[in-house]
Design a protein with these regions (language model features):
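Sec/Tat signal peptide C-region and signal peptidase I cleavage site
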Residues: 27-31
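Sec-dependent N-terminal signal peptides
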Residues: 17-26
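Intrinsically disordered, low-complexity proline/glycine-rich segments
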Residues: 32-148
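Short helix-onset patch at the extreme N-terminus, typifying the N->h transition
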Residues: 7-8, 20-21, 36
Length: 148
């Protein structure tokens, strides 16, 4: 005689393992790691624009309309559709070019965000890594606003 309770137990365990695997994938997709030049984790940018430090404390937000907020939801800047970065008073603080070049308000190159997520200063020295983070978001985090 076959003991059906064992099969039910195995089925329930498989469901739990599957659910854990799906949750793990969801967490991996939701947040991209921001790293220093030595690949130490300095923070995270979630797919919804939430900026977190390495301890997962929220430090800011990048909203879908381009508004940049601090952790208290006060507006500190804007990302315009043409790559212009503005402060809270709508003064231009810099530009993110389509090729990944980052410029200050005077159009001097201050850095680069490469296709592979490498972030470089104006001398092409690596200052960090932003993985699959949008270029504009990486520029905001590395060059234009401090989220400490």
């Amino acid at each position: 005689m076959v003991n059906l309770s064992i099969f039910k137990q195995i089925k329930n365990n498989m469901k739990k393992i599957f659910a854990i695997a799906i949750l793990g994938l969801a967490f991996n997709v939701k947040a991209q790691t921001i790293e220093s030049s030595s690949h130490s984790t300095t923070g995270y940018v979630k797919s919804d624009g939430t900026i977190e430090n390495s301890s997962h404390s929220t430090k800011g937000y990048i909203k879908s309309d381009g508004t940049i907020e601090n952790s208290s939801h006060s507006t500190i800047g804007y990302i315009k559709s043409d790559g212009t970065i503005e402060n809270s008073s709508h003064s231009t603080v810099g530009y993110v070019k389509k090729d990944g070049t980052i410029e200050n308000s005077s159009h001097s190159t201050i850095g680069y965000v490469k296709d592979n997520g490498t972030v470089e200063n104006s001398s092409h020295s690596t200052i960090g890594h932003a993985g699959n983070v949008k270029r504009e978001w990486a520029a905001v985090v590395f060059f234009f606003f401090k989220f400490n």
